[in-house]
């Protein structure tokens, strides 16, 4: 999704 993956890149950060 947009704000649901545990990645530190993109529109959202992990957490």
From Swiss-Prot:
Intracellular or extracellular location(s): Secreted; Nematocyst
MF-aspect GO terms: ion channel regulator activity; serine-type endopeptidase inhibitor activity; toxin activity
Presence of the UniProt keyword Secreted in the record: yes
Cellular compartments per GO CC: extracellular region; nematocyst
Reactive bond for trypsin, annotated site positions: 13-14
Principal location class: secreted
The keyword Disulfide bond is annotated on this UniProt entry: yes
UniProt entry keywords in alphabetical sequence: Disulfide bond, Ion channel impairing toxin, Nematocyst, Protease inhibitor, Secreted, Serine protease inhibitor, Toxin
Source superkingdom: Eukaryota
Protein family: Belongs to the venom Kunitz-type family. Sea anemone type 2 potassium channel toxin subfamily.
Extra information: A synonymy between H.magnifica and R.crispa is controversial.
Function: This recombinant serine protease inhibitor inhibits both trypsin (Ki=2.4 nM) and chymotrypsin (Ki=23 nM). It may also inhibit the TRPV1 receptor, a receptor of the pain pathway. In vivo, shows anti-histamine activity, since it dose-dependently weakens the clinical manifestation of the allergic reaction induced by histamine injection. In vivo, does not show toxicity to mice by intraperitoneal injection.
Name of the protein this chain belongs to: PI-stichotoxin-Hcr2k
Originating species: Radianthus crispa (Leathery sea anemone)
């Amino acid at each position: 999704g947009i704000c649901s993956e545990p990645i530190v890149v993109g529109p959202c950060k992990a957490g």
